[in-house]
């Protein structure tokens, strides 16, 4: 396997499952740190701030700094701020998204007369919130969604994800949003911009083909699939565009890198 100069790394299913570290995750990050190889954690989670994500990883023994975390909320806020500085926004979502938006100088409003409607995962979503978002889009606001994951794994099972909430507004208005998170290029290009390396020197590491591996393929970087999450080795073998590599787990990746 090629030795890359930097890595983009998925979290759920790659680094951890729920609140438990996946075997090999801490060792993989330790290896990268010992070799002074830069890496970023790229997550579609818009509800958490980078500090919270890093704290969770550190609690599991996986070394992480807040500035190594790229969330769909951060990428969304930067996308809007670059396109329309100081724009007004109506949003669905948590503090991770609201803080990211205001940090970029965007103005949050609680009505449908705005420049942008942004939908992020909102665990307190209501009919009224969906109605305001729908009216905002109908009024001409640009429609943005942090990510298109229709379901998310929780202790109870797979629960509705942000893609499911987004679809309510999309179906009602007939307007398709601009998606920011994986597998879309927007969040990946943001992460690559931070690394500032040639794309041939960067690899994406993840477990889910449709999200993680496709995110790498969509921005022309190599991909490393680990069989510790959703997509199995058997499913990978059936893909018309396979990942560059597939491994049982991150321990196998370390062994390859140490050769």
Swiss-Prot record:
Recorded GO CC terms: cytoplasm
Enzyme class name: hydrolase
Cofactor: Mg(2+)
Keywords: Hydrolase, Magnesium, Metal-binding
SUPFAM superfamilies in UniProt: HAD-like
Keyword Magnesium among UniProt keywords: yes
E.C. designation(s): 3.1.3.-
Source organism, top-level taxon: Bacteria
Function: Catalyzes the dephosphorylation of 2-6 carbon acid sugars in vitro.
UniProt family annotation: Belongs to the HAD-like hydrolase superfamily. NagD family.
Name of the molecule in the record: Acid sugar phosphatase
